[in-house]
Amino acid sequence: MDEDQGPAQIVPGTTPKKTIGDRVRGAKRALFTKDGLVGTYDYAFLFRPNLPFMRKSRQNSPFFGLNDQMPTLLALLLGFQHALGMLAGVITPPILMSGAAGANLTTSQQQYLVSTALIVSGFLSMIQITRFHIYKTNYYIGTGLLSVAGISFSIIPVAQGALSQMYANGFCPSDADGNRLPCPEGYGAILGTSAITALTIVLISFLPPKIMLKIFPPIVTGPTVLLIGVKLIESGFKNWMGGSGPCASPSTAVGFFASCPNIAAPHALPWGSPEYFGLGLSVFVAIIAAERFGSPIMKSCAVIIGLLVGCIIAAAAGYFDRSGIDAAPAVSFVWVKTFPLSLYGPLVLPLIAVYIICATEAIGDITATCDVSRLEVEGHTYESRIQGGVLADGINGILAALMTITPVTTFAQNNGIIALTRCANRSAGYCCCFFLIIMGIFSKFAASLIAIPSSVLGGMTTFLFAAVAVSGMAIINKGVVFNRRSRFILTAGFVFGYGGILLTGYFDNVLKYDGDNKGLHDADAAEVASVNDRAILQGDDSARTTSEDAQPVTQEGLKGEEKLH
């Protein structure tokens, strides 16, 4: 099947009006007839591997437009495929920001955040897919496309930089030896500030898309996304080699943390051990194999397949700790655990920058979704989808923070699934939301994800973070003409962008403050946004971190260290 072939005409983008009777008859057909349940789709195509000696199918599968009728079984199957394609991207940010290099939350809190991230992504994706008209206006909320929402990667370096500052100035607690203790207050400060700064993207959404792109051109957003990806690759590799907590630093890898994640963990080894490298490499190789030789459904969830292969090897070798899985509750939901919301001043400007990045990325993602869905990519309908999608991202950012999750944005990787399966139908999108919510409710699933060894998770996240960097390159390549002026602007911006990544502490003593204001200690907002703001400096000239250890440093862990001595 050639996924690039399809109907020459643009399929209708408007939703046909249906009476209650039409909906009842449609439901009966979908649930109680063979044609409505199964249809005539070539299901074998989804599972047919791409092996060199196998004959390729020459028969084109049908293209399911936005509002076309499609078999119920196919909608469920493709929805599950979309959910698997999103899974790695949804769970990675909460794992990173709640672990040893982030807020160092307890294992139960980490499990809750992973479960909630899946639930929130499912509910907020429904807003994008449904598309609501704002009464007596020309504005909409949502795209009305198969646009799914997941946790933004752009927040990770900003949040981790802010948390490091909070530990340094005493906002977050540390023990007598300087080891980080759980800091739910710090995570709550990120959420509270995120909810307020999300209003930025709400205001931006009422600007025409052309003006948005002129204010934030690709020469600004492309390098920003690229630098975020490069910064995250560094931390992904750190986890690949064993972890990102105290065990990763020679100065702190002593006593209880002489091995990663600590000496009490099963099969603990020193950071950088060849066994850890091999575990991460098994994930990386499995991802490549699934992408090269896998069936369409395997290709769309290659990252999850790689993670599964790594988990099987790690479990067989005795790297898994089941205690967290056994202790986890059977089910979970939003607000089972809460965090004290607050406004943290140094985070305001960096988070505004993050939301600006999310808005510009959303424009590109929605345009790509329209393209693969065989819908207009210009004109009033297209512009209203852009406006509705960006506005939904802003509203979703506020709702996500109130539901204890960091900013949510549209996901681009699902566009590849639409092109591959030739299905842009919203029914598959709603099924995707259903599966995400179910995965989140059953918290044993989240607990098993938290228990994954850091080296296995690092092999997966390094691949994802490299994809973020490549996305930044693609933005630059598509939207920037490489003349002398643009090269000069990029060069000037990359001086501080790459410099700050390679030498992270260069700014530590530039803005020293010795007063009583904790928000001004050691650094200001510009330092917290060490990656984002340096890239955005290019815009002034021109006008998706770490995988946390599964066992955070808690009071119980420190008591265990004392017993060992």
Residue ranges and their predicted role:
Residues 2-146, 169, 180, 521-523, ...:
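N-terminal alpha-helical transmembrane segments of multi-pass membrane transport
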Residues 2-46, 105-114, 214, 271-272, ...:
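Flexible hinge motifs at transmembrane-helix junctions and intramembrane kinks/re-entrant loops
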Residues 63-71, 338-346, 382-383:
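Helix-boundary and loop/linker segments of multi-pass membrane transporters
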Residues 72, 98-142, 350-426:
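Membrane-embedded helical hairpins/re-entrant loop segments and their flanking transmembrane helices
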Residues 73-278, 455, 459-460, 472-476, ...:
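Early transmembrane hairpin of solute transport permeases
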Residues 81-82, 119-129, 157-162, 197-205, ...:
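Hydrophobic core segments of alpha-helical transmembrane domains in multi-pass membrane transport
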Residues 182, 210-218, 414-432, 442-465, ...:
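Transmembrane helix-loop boundary segments of multi-pass membrane transporters
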